[in-house]
Amino acid sequence: MVNQSLKNKKIIISAGASGIGLATAKVCLARGATVYLCDIDSKSLNKLNKHPLKNKKLFAYLCDASNEYHVSDFFNKVIKKTKKIDALINNVGIAGPTGSLEKLKSKDWENTLHVDVNSHFYFTKKAIPLLKKSKNGSIINISSTAGILGFPLRSPYAASKWAIIGVTKTLAMELGKFNIRVNAVCPGTIKGDRMKRVIKDKAKFT
């Protein structure tokens, strides 16, 4: 039987205050890990203040993952708590605009790729030195089925998720010699506020 204990493991989760990130954090905590999460949503972070493990096993910080300076500041805070981490879960991602490619605004395309791809770069770059200190490190990138199959009327989102798959495969080859595994998870539709907005936007085109 596979040992699912995460006792004494140190895990970083970006965009960890809601949705997939929060659900992942709860599972990690339940299995004994110490979790360092960040999010741009201060209201969601405030809700975590009531968590029984807050400031013991759960450390939550405000951070704009699309801003490299903010990410560096977040890691500086983590390093004050621990000198190594065992896993990084890159969960940042926005839905981006809905519409046919020829009607998209360049700024919306660029913003989607900036947030969804560059955030992974910022976090991974900072995490690798800490992961190398672990005997069995892991990077988990949250991509999407859109990164495998495409997604009509959501080309910026699909492009960003395909990019994550490419980076994942490349880093798996680069970091294997350091005993760092790199994998991507590709969820389908997840119930939540973001999906409600996507459905509402897409309904305008049907």
Describe the predicted segments one by one.
Residues S5-Y36:
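Canonical Rossmann dinucleotide-binding motif of NAD(H)/NADP(H)-dependent dehydrogenases/reductases
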Residues G99-L101, K105-L113, A203:
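Substrate-binding pocket helix/loop in short-chain dehydrogenase/reductase
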Residues L101-E102, L149-S155, K177-F178:
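Active-site loop immediately N-terminal to the catalytic Tyr-X3-Lys motif
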Residues T124, S160, T168:
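Active-site helix of classical SDR
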Residues P129, M173-K177:
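Alpha-helical segment proximal to the catalytic Tyr-Lys
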Residues S144:
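Residue(s) in the substrate-gating loop at a strand-loop-helix junction
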Residues V182, C186-R197, D201:
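Short, flexible catalytic-loop segment of classical short-chain dehydrogenase/reductase
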